[in-house]
């Protein structure tokens, strides 16, 4: 019951503060100071007062964690900074090599790292503005994830309103959503009692709970959020461990096993301690993450295209089991790679029922000598990917034959080829092969290919599933009424996509070549081919020796191009695209002009005011230059715009010539660009 004789607003605020404090003590600190019945009484009083005074309800009130009705679907969230994955270490030697690279790059020995358990859950990013939770999303592809705000609000270890003071006006808190082992067991017991299929493991339970359209279901799953960092917040401190301390002070849960360690020996010792305690932990883990603690050092180390150079995940040893191979099947991936997959008698491994295991490639099948009917040892590498580690040859049945790679793609019938420098066999069906369709279409529409704005993964998936698009040429037959009928499309988005498709009909020969997705043909190679041959017909009809004469095209790339165009299906795709109106201007090899910057390597950094970095890159490459993403002793020039950062400092230390934007413009004008 609500108290009488007091100011309702003041009492509501007092109740909210008290409930937030108890939530923090219970769900973050694991140190409650009142009984559940007392907590329930406080919440009941707050809810009663807010019911009497609905004008006083605020989104960050503890009573508003659970939305009242299911959502119709998940929207998208664009992360302020990409949520990159981590490189993995599967053996101690991998960790030692990582430490060596870091020490060498920084000139430090030893390096101080922050070590933390790699929780086996779902990574999420939670955005706060002025101290209040406004948005939450999954990792997704690293740039765009699914909006799960209402579900994340139900997690009691996630503050709806930040504690303390000193937090930035905007920040994205990154972390892992997990479910305790004990809560997972109770959840599965209840699902069995309700006649539902139990979850295979805690990670699946956590991920499935976050993707419920009804947040009331999520609220009943007792999820926990552990933060492991922050983005888009500016410089909060000098080190990662200080940032974690600040996040803890603002109300977030930081894993109690996070520690600072010194050098490789400290990393090893932490790993062994955590491994020894693994079965006693309340949460599932699948490894240890090591991060360079000093944030200036992180900036100096930088990133690769997919992962930071200052962090690594050392995977824990997998658990193994014995089972029997029913048969070996060739599986065609989205890039055309054909992977032998062993179909197994189902067996439990690390809490998961395993019925298939990858054999990677033909060399691996031969090395392990896996055959149909064999008894094998199976493990989940890093507790995730099932693989066969050994064959018990003593139990091999008589007449078991070695497995052979098929000569034709099991999906489309195209030639299967192993390029000279590759371990994998590939289907040469390219854009024609149904198994490669979605991946090929996404590549075809990507920014550096035909740049079809609005044709993302979810749209392509629907178009393929509904049979609306079987080849790239089908894209150009799509009409507004067809697109508007897709999920989360709408009239305006359909109009925009139709316009983008129409615009994409007018492209360039290098972009078209790149869009075809030929193995080893990137944007630079595509441009070299266009410049060397001048027309698509000349490229399609060239043999391997003629192709290999192209600058930057060696025998392996020439082989891939020749086999791609030797496949009749691929020629039919090209013909269909031209019939659909895709055009470009041919390049006259005789009029390509000089390449005055051939052999010179440039690096671009910072913000340019007169052009984008992509435009600057294109202009330099048109003059024969190579544009790299990192500074090294082989770099000839660094073009430094505003806020150039660590690349400028490294260039100066290596004696690399630095050009400002004005000097770049002068260089381009000198050569007629």
Swiss-Prot record:
InterPro entries named in the record: BRCT_dom, BRCT_dom_sf, DisA/LigA_HHH, DNA_ligase, DNA_ligase_CS, DNAligase_adenylation, DNAligase_N, Hlx-hairpin-Hlx_DNA-bd_motif
Q: Report the gene name.
A: ligA
Q: Which GO terms describe its molecular function?
A: DNA binding; DNA ligase (NAD+) activity; metal ion binding
Q: Where is the BRCT domain?
A: 592-673
Asked whether the UniProt record includes DNA repair among its keywords, one would answer yes
Give the family from UniProt: Belongs to the NAD-dependent DNA ligase family. LigA subfamily.
What GO biological process term is on the record, naming one?
DNA replication
EC number, UniProt record: 6.5.1.2
- SUPFAM superfamilies membership: BRCT domain, DNA ligase/mRNA capping enzyme, catalytic domain, Nucleic acid-binding proteins, RuvA domain 2-like
Q: Which HAMAP family match?
A: DNA_ligase_A
Q: Which residues hold Zn(2+)?
A: 409, 412, 427, 433
Catalysed reactions, semicolon-separated: NAD(+) + (deoxyribonucleotide)n-3'-hydroxyl + 5'-phospho-(deoxyribonucleotide)m = (deoxyribonucleotide)n+m + AMP + beta-nicotinamide D-nucleotide
Q: What does this protein do?
A: DNA ligase that catalyzes the formation of phosphodiester linkages between 5'-phosphoryl and 3'-hydroxyl groups in double-stranded DNA using NAD as a coenzyme and as the energy source for the reaction. It is essential for DNA replication and repair of damaged DNA.
Please report the name of this protein according to its UniProt entry.
Answer: DNA ligase
Q: Which PANTHER family does UniProt cross-reference here?
A: CHROMOSOME TRANSMISSION FIDELITY FACTOR 18, DNA LIGASE
UniProt keyword annotations, A-Z: DNA damage, DNA repair, DNA replication, Ligase, Magnesium, Manganese, Metal-binding, NAD, Zinc
Metal-binding among keywords: yes
Binding-site positions, NAD(+): 36-40, 85-86, 116, 139, 176, 291, 315
Active site (catalytic residues): 118
The enzyme's first-digit EC class, named in words, is: ligase
């Amino acid at each position: 019951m609500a108290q009488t004789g007091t100011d309702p607003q003041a009492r509501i605020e007092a109740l909210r503060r008290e409930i937030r404090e108890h939530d923090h003590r219970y769900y973050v600190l694991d140190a409650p100071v009142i009984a559940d019945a007392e907590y329930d009484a406080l919440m009941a009083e707050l809810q009663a007062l807010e019911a009497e005074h609905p004008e006083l309800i605020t989104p960050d009130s503890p009573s508003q964690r659970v939305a009242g009705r299911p959502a119709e679907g998940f929207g998208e969230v664009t992360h302020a900074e990409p949520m990159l994955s981590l490189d993995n270490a599967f053996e101690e030697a991998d960790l030692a090599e990582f430490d060596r690279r870091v020490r060498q790059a920084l000139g430090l020995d030893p390096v101080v790292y922050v070590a933390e358990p790699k929780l086996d859950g779902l990574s999420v990013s939670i955005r706060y503005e002025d101290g209040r939770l406004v948005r939450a999303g999954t990792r997704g592809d690293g740039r765009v994830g699914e909006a799960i705000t209402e579900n994340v609000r139900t997690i009691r270890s996630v503050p709806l309103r930040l504690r303390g003071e000193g937090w930035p006006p905007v920040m994205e808190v990154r972390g892992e959503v997990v479910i305790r082992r004990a809560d997972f067991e109770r959840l599965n017991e209840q699902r069995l009692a309700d006649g539902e299929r139990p979850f295979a493991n805690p990670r699946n339970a956590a991920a499935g709970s976050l993707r419920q359209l009804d947040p009331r279901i999520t609220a009943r799953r007792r999820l926990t959020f552990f933060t492991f960092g922050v983005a888009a917040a500016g410089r909060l401190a000098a080190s990662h461990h200080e940032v974690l301390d600040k996040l803890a002070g603002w109300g977030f849960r930081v894993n109690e096993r996070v520690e600072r360690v010194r050098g490789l020996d400290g990393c090893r010792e932490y790993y062994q301690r955590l491994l020894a305690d693994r079965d006693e932990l309340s949460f599932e883990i699948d490894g240890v993450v090591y991060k360079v603690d000093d944030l200036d050092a992180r900036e100096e180390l930088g990133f690769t295209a997919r992962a930071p150079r200052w962090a690594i995940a050392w995977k824990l040893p997998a658990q193994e089991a014995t089972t029997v191979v029913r048969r070996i099947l060739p599986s065609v991936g989205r890039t055309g790679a054909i992977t032998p997959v062993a179909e197994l008698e189902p067996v439990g491994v690390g809490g998961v029922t395993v019925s298939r295991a990858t054999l990677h490639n033909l060399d691996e099948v031969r090395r392990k000598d896996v055959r149909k009917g064999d008894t094998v040892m199976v493990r989940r590498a890093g507790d995730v990917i099932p693989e066969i580690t050994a064959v018990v040859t003593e139990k091999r049945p008589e007449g078991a034959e070695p497995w052979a790679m098929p000569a034709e793609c099991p999906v489309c019938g195209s030639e299967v080829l192993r390029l000279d420098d590759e371990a994998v066999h590939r289907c040469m069906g390219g854009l024609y092969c149904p198994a490669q369709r979605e991946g090929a279409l996404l590549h075809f529409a990507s920014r550096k290919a035909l740049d079809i704005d609005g044709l993302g993964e979810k749209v392509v998936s629907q178009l393929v599933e509904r049979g609306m698009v079987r080849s790239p040429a089908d894209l150009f037959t799509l009409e507004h009424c067809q697109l508007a009928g897709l999920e989360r499309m709408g009239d305006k988005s359909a109009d925009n996509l139709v316009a983008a498709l129409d615009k994409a009909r007018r492209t360039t020969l290098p972009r078209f070549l790149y869009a075809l997705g030929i193995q080893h043909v990137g944007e630079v190679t595509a441009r070299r081919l266009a410049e060397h041959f001048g027309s698509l017909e000349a490229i399609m009809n060239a043999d391997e020796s003629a192709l290999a004469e192209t600058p930057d095209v060696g025998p392996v790339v020439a082989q891939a191009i020749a086999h791609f165009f030797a496949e009749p299906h691929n020629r039919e795709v090209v013909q269909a695209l031209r019939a659909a109106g895709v055009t470009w201007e041919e390049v006259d090899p005789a009029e390509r002009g000089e390449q005055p910057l051939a052999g010179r390597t440039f690096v671009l950094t910072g913000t340019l005011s007169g052009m984008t970095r992509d435009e600057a890159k294109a202009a330099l490459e048109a003059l024969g230059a190579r544009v790299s993403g990192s500074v090294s002793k082989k770099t000839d020039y660094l073009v430094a715009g505003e806020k150039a950062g660590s690349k400028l400092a490294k260039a100066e230390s290596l004696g690399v010539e630095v050009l400002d934007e004005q000097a770049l413009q002068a260089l381009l004008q000198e050569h007629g660009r």
